[in-house]
Amino acid sequence: MGIKVYKPTTNGRRNMTSLDFAEITTSTPEKSLLVSLKNKAGRNNNGRITVRHQGGGHKRHYRVIDFKRNKDNVEAVVKTIEYDPNRTANIALVHYTDGVKAYIIAPKGLEVGQRIISGPEADIKIGNALPLANIPVGTVIHNIEMKPGKGGELVRAAGASAQVLGQEGKYVLVRLQSGEVRMILGTCRATIGSVGNEQQSLVNIGKAGRNRWKGVRPTVRGSVMNPNDHPHGGGEGKAPVGRKAPSTPWGKPALGLKTRNKKAKSDKLIIRRRNEK
């Protein structure tokens, strides 16, 4: 998928780019796989903001994605490659030979008419899903399960990929996109190939209004707020923070504080941290 560059007809259009959507084969989604999606604008059930900078944006339907890929030994044909407003990756509509329809994350190189299959004996081909223990060392994978049968949780964003490094007993060593190397149970499933739409990260938004279409609201600096709104607020003119270190709006240390649970049981499964050189 290529990048479309706009002419600088206005200040907002200057340097603006977008995807050309050349890979998209249809603009009409499969109706049976759509679910209504209510705009919560970052609020919880008490009406309080729990996620800032969310609200507005275009109405969307949620596309039900098959992250489990547990329909073993039933072949499916790729019918369409579609845009999904709820994620950076594109999705593919597949029709199984038994009549079931499903959406999957569209890997790079997947084409309409291609046949895919899931199961322990599936071939190592783009779009096929199988247990990690059955995938050869060096294979590029995505949509990786953390727990058997739960569905893919890792490596689902546009352009993301991971690689199988080896096997130790019942665990498989996987290098993730961040550089982290961790052990995952060999019975967990993954899909062959990297996620498509890899040029999505190169798009220049160009103007604030385009982010508002996506439901992203402005981010305001704490230093320009009032002292009752943010620890950095108040003072006369451009005042400094007034603390030992920058803080979050809730008074906790910002910039570099480790938030991971020090007693996390999964620590023993992480062989190499993402920030280790």
Swiss-Prot record:
NCBIfam families: rplB_bact. It comes from the Bacteria. It holds the Pfam family Ribosomal_L2. Residues 218-277 are annotated as: Disordered. GO terms for biological process: cytoplasmic translation. GO terms for cellular component: large ribosomal subunit. SUPFAM superfamilies: Nucleic acid-binding proteins, Translation proteins SH3-like domain. GO terms for molecular function: rRNA binding; structural constituent of ribosome; transferase activity. This is Large ribosomal subunit protein uL2. Belongs to the universal ribosomal protein uL2 family. PANTHER family: LARGE RIBOSOMAL SUBUNIT PROTEIN UL2M, RIBOSOMAL PROTEIN L2. The gene is rplB. InterPro entries: NA-bd_OB-fold, Rib_uL2_dom2, Ribosomal_uL2, Ribosomal_uL2_bac/org-type, Ribosomal_uL2_C, Ribosomal_uL2_CS, Ribosomal_uL2_dom3, Ribosomal_uL2_RNA-bd_dom. Keywords: Ribonucleoprotein, Ribosomal protein, RNA-binding, rRNA-binding. Residues 264-277 have a biased composition (Basic and acidic residues). Disulfide bonds: none annotated. Coiled coil: none annotated. Part of the 50S ribosomal subunit. Forms a bridge to the 30S subunit in the 70S ribosome. One of the primary rRNA binding proteins. Required for association of the 30S and 50S subunits to form the 70S ribosome, for tRNA binding and peptide bond formation. It has been suggested to have peptidyltransferase activity; this is somewhat controversial. Makes several contacts with the 16S rRNA in the 70S ribosome. Gene3D superfamilies: 2.30.30.30, Nucleic acid-binding proteins, Ribosomal protein L2, domain 3.
